Amino acid sequence: MENKKMHHKRYIAGGMVSLVFMIVCLTGLIVSASGAGNVNTDPSSDERVWNLGVIQMSVSNYWDGVWNLSFKRASDGFVEERNMRIEDAEAQKLYADISCGTVPDGSSLILWLVQGDKAESVDVTDLSEPLEYPLEGFEEGKIHVRLQINGVEDVTSEITIQ
């Protein structure tokens, strides 16, 4: 009878060791990611932007060169991004049809175009018509297209390069 009571202890001990190891690894990951300035939150940077906030009820898809994004609300400073390609910078333009349903005082929606050391931003909070933005100052190749969300809600957008 004593043998039946003892055989579960090693499984419990193994589970406890695994739990402690998992907590140590998670803590190490969080400390290494957030410490020493490793988290990039600058939307004008050519590096990947890490978000420290949340976005709610977000739908984002990229199909046939068109990026569609809609969301209910997001933390201030939240950045959504999509990499697109410029084939002919002299002839192509970025087209953005963006509408913000709710715009509280002091809120904004900023469109960032980033390629290498070049970064340009456009306030697209209150567009009365779709934006046509020339890409003449950029080079052919990959470009980061970012939306920096600062308090706006109920946003729908369609962005493409043609």
Regions found by a protein language model. Give the residues of each.
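Extended extracellular/luminal ectodomain segments enriched in beta-structured repeat modules
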Residues: 87-95, 140
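Short, surface-exposed beta-strand/strand-loop-strand elements in extracellular ectodomains
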Residues: 104-120
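Short strand-edge motifs at loop-to-beta-strand transitions and within beta-strands
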Residues: 80-82, 129-133, 141
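Edge beta-strands of jelly-roll/beta-sandwich modules across compartments, strongly enriched
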Residues: 149-162
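Short beta-strand segments within Ig-like beta-sandwich modules, predominantly Fibronectin type-III
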Residues: 122-127
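Transition segment at domain starts
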Residues: 35-85
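Extended, low-complexity, turn-rich repeat/linker tracts enriched in Gly/Pro/Ser/Thr and Asp/Glu
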Residues: 99-109, 151-154
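Gram-positive cell-envelope targeting signals
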Residues: 1-41
